[in-house]
């Protein structure tokens, strides 16, 4: 969380991979076709769809990913020039076991 005196905006977000762009594009349709499926099951179904699509379809998402990556790199350069390198965010590990 940002404090009030922290005037530095958040750095640009990393671009999504080609698969995640595909997932984003297909999620609602797969969910509509499988309304009772869990999120993990939906993701597996989308992964199967991804494996089944042709190279031409994958190329479309890879191109979108490349464009997003180029924009991210440009935005990141501008951010670093203005604010310096962003601090590394510490990953918060979620403890799956309940603590006693």
Curated annotation (Swiss-Prot):
Question: From the UniProt annotation, which stretches of this protein bind DNA?
Answer: 12-80
- Transmembrane region(s): none
Q: Which domain of life is it from?
A: Eukaryota
Q: Name one GO molecular function term.
A: DNA binding
| InterPro entries referenced in this protein's UniProt entry, alphabetically | HMG_box_dom (IPR009071), HMG_box_dom_sf (IPR036910), HMGB (IPR050342)
The entry's protein name is High mobility group protein C
UniProt-listed Pfam families = HMG_box
PANTHER family for this protein? HIGH MOBILITY GROUP PROTEIN B3, HIGH MOBILITY GROUP PROTEIN DSP1
For bias type Basic residues, the affected ranges are 90-100
List localization entries.
Nucleus; Chromosome
Extract one GO cellular component term from the record: nucleus
| Region annotation (Disordered) ranges | 81-100
Which PROSITE patterns does UniProt cross-reference here? HMG_BOX_2
Q: Which SUPFAM superfamilies match?
A: HMG-box (SSF47095)
Record's keyword terms, sorted: Chromosome, DNA-binding, Nucleus
């Amino acid at each position: 969380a940002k404090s009030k005196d922290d005037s530095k905006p958040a750095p640009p977000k990393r671009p999504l991979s080609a698969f995640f762009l595909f997932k984003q594009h297909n999620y609602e349709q797969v969910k509509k076709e499988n309304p009772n499926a869990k999120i993990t099951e939906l993701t597996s179904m989308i992964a199967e769809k991804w494996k089944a699509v042709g190279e031409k379809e994958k190329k479309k998402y890879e191109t979108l990913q490349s464009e997003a990556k180029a924009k991210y790199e440009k935005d990141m350069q501008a951010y670093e020039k203005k604010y310096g390198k962003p601090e590394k965010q510490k990953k918060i590990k979620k403890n799956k076991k309940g603590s006693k």
